[in-house]
Each structure stands twice: as structure tokens, then as C-alpha cells.
Regions:
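A short, terminal or domain-edge coil/loop segment
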Residues: 86-88, 149-162, 186-203
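Membrane-proximal basic amphipathic "stem/tether" segments
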Residues: 171-229
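Core SAM-dependent methyltransferase catalytic element
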Residues: 143-177
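Conserved SAM-binding loop
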Residues: 1-110, 114-119, 158
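Conserved S-adenosyl-L-methionine
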Residues: 129-140
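Nucleic-acid endo/exonuclease domains
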Residues: 1, 140-143
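Hydrophobic alpha-helical packing residues
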Residues: 23-24, 124, 129
Length: 229
């Protein structure tokens, strides 16, 4: 998100660190990717010293602060009782937090904690962080970006983090008492309505099948690319 221009960024639930690599390419000088010990170090998109193994259901403490903390589509994979722990870890790391998590009915593999946006908004508010709905309007029509990022991403900022925010972001502050609502196209909203009626096992099976298809397509494209060379 170019308006923020952070120089230090931490990502909780980073996977291989792909987002951190993108922030680095965008000008961030110091990044830290944090995820479980299961992440294959040989597949990291960042340097090994830029990765930290941690259990996200437990407090993550790095002993330092960052210009920006982020967690994108991670909260839905953690038990509901770990929701406040995740937010605690994020707010401990920065005055500004870029956050998204799957909403109710989104569906996905290993989703155990899909919640309305207001669920997370309330947890951040208890920590003194206000929602700024600056990301969704900027991305909503960009179909090159996955819908869960376009429709779920919210910037949370505390009083200290307000200092230096561009006026374009300040103008998007969600008024006190106003709950965040789902965004998205008609098709996306219909998907949410349908999926939330399905048993979790069915949703997981669909998500796994879709992941297999996408993986096969990716491998096929890679093979064709090599053949062309």
C-alpha cells in the first residue's frame, strides 16, 4: 500500500514471506516474516535471518517495534480463543496494523474462525486502534488481486500511529460506533450467503479440490514455459 511507505514491516502468518519480499521491493529496508516452524526454510522468499518461527496462538514478542505490522488472511486459521492473542501480538509490534481475515461464509481450507469484520474491529478497538477503510475502495475493482484481500483488508491505527498519516488515509477513518460491513460484488456476496449454509467438511473438500486444480495448472504452465525455452 504505497501511501504508508513503511521502512520496517513485520508479517504474522507470513508463510514463505512472499508479502515481505514485496514490501522489500517496494522500499522497506527491514522486514520480518513470522510463521510456524513448519515453513520450509529452503523455500523462503526472504533471507533466513528475516524469518522467525513462532506459534501464533501464543504471544509473539520480538523486543522491537515496526512501522507496520500485518496479518493477511491468517486469523481464520487460528482457534477463536486465539483471536485476541493475535491482535495483541500485532499491536505489540506496531502502531499501525494492516489486517484481513476471512469473513463468515468465505470458505477455505482449514478455516476454523471465520468472523464478521466487526468481530476483529471490536478487538482492535479495545486496544485503542481505530479502523481506517482505505484499502478496500482502492482495490475493489482490481480483479488481479484475490477478492479476500480486496474486500477484507482494513488498516487499524492507534493515536500514536495517526501522526504522519496522509490525508487520504485520515479521511477514511470509520466513525466511532460504526461497524464495518462486508464489501464485494454481487457474486461475492452470493458466495458468502451460500457457503455459510454448507457443512464445514463440504467447504473444506471444495477448497482442497480447488487448490489441487490450481496447483496442477501452475505446474502445467511451468512445464510449458520450460518447453518453450
Amino acid at each position: 500500500f504505497p501511501l504508508l511507505k513503511p521502512t520496517t514491516v513485520i508479517d504474522l502468518g507470513s508463510g514463505r514471506g512472499v508479502w515481505m519480499d514485496e514490501w522489500r521491493k517496494g522500499g522497506a529496508e527491514d522486514v520480518l516474516a513470522v510463521d510456524g516452524d513448519y515453513v520450509d526454510r529452503a523455500q523462503l522468499a526472504v533471507a533466513p535471518e528475516q524469518f522467525m518461527a513462532a506459534d501464533l496462538t501464543q504471544p509473539v514478542k520480538t523486543g522491537r517495534r515496526f512501522d507496520l505490522a500485518q496479518s493477511l488472511e491468517v486469523g481464520e486459521h487460528l482457534p477463536t480463543e486465539a483471536s485476541e492473542v493475535l491482535v495483541d501480538s500485532l499491536t505489540r509490534a506496531s502502531d499501525r496494523v494492516l489486517f484481513s481475515a476471512a469473513v463468515t461464509g468465505q470458505g477455505g481450507e482449514f478455516h476454523v474462525n471465520e468472523q464478521p469484520l466487526s468481530f476483529w474491529q471490536d478487538i482492535f478497538a479495545a486496544k485503542g486502534y481505530v479502523a481506517y477503510d482505505c484499502v478496500r475502495p482502492a482495490l475493489k475493482d482490481n480483479k488481479d488481486i484475490a477478492p479476500w484481500y480486496r474486500y477484507n483488508a482494513i488498516l487499524y491505527v492507534n493515536e500514536a500511529g495517526r501522526a504522519g498519516l496522509p490525508k487520504e488515509i485520515l479521511a477514511t477513518q470509520v466513525p466511532a460506533g460504526q461497524k464495518l460491513r462486508n464489501a464485494g460484488s454481487l457474486g461475492w456476496r452470493l458466495r458468502l450467503a451460500v457457503v455459510k449454509t454448507l457443512p464445514r467438511g463440504v467447504v473444506t473438500a471444495i477448497a482442497q479440490a480447488r487448490a489441487m486444480v490450481l496447483a496442477l495448472r501452475a505446474r502445467r504452465a511451468k512445464t510449458l514455459g520450460r518447453a518453450a525455452v
